Amino acid sequence: WCPAAVATEDRPAARAPARAVEGPVASIAVADHVFRAPKGTRDILWPDSSRWRSLVDVFADVVSSAGYLEVIPPMFEHVEVFQRLGQATDVVRKEMYSFEDRGGRNIALRPEQTASVVRAFAEHRPAVPWKAWYAGPNFRYERAQKGRFRQFDQVGVEVLGPEDAHVDAEVIALAWQFYERLGLRQVTLAVNSLGSAGDRARYVDALRAHFSADLGALSE
């Protein structure tokens, strides 16, 4: 569950002229784009930075009262950690920032944190139920536009171990409490179900069959 995200508007892609920059050693020619945040990112300055920190503090207070403990996963993982999300997902196929490091390992910046939390659970084997919360930036190479950005911050919770519908209800209730604490009043809560793993697999197959004849006419 990730109830909040922060990011920025698109940046102009036009090539800017170079200019001289005076430094302590020598003058160097640096293109203007060097002095702008990369496309799909931004600098979060005060007072926005203070508002974001306050939002995280409220979230931490709400979920900690229900027994959730903070986990801080690394910002990059072995790419296989995220490939387990599913090869058919846009995140895996088109949106991951992945690279080979100097040791020859395939690494990816995290596009979300659920997979990292599950990996941490498998590695450290904490007592169950393990109730974890997190906050921090994620990275996706997607088309930068208003409301969707290449670096964005999230807060969220995961519960690992039990298969209990009460856990689902608890997480939904925590989301509601969080929005209330933020002073949001016009919030509508809609609850649905994605079905079982078998249901989802059949649904994906049906969608592929339905759209396969028109693939050339579909946008990415």
Give, region by region, the residue ranges found by the protein language model.
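TRNA-recognition modules of translation machinery and tRNA-sensing kinases, especially anticodon-binding
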Residues: A7-E220
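Cysteine-centered metal-binding/redox modules
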Residues: A4
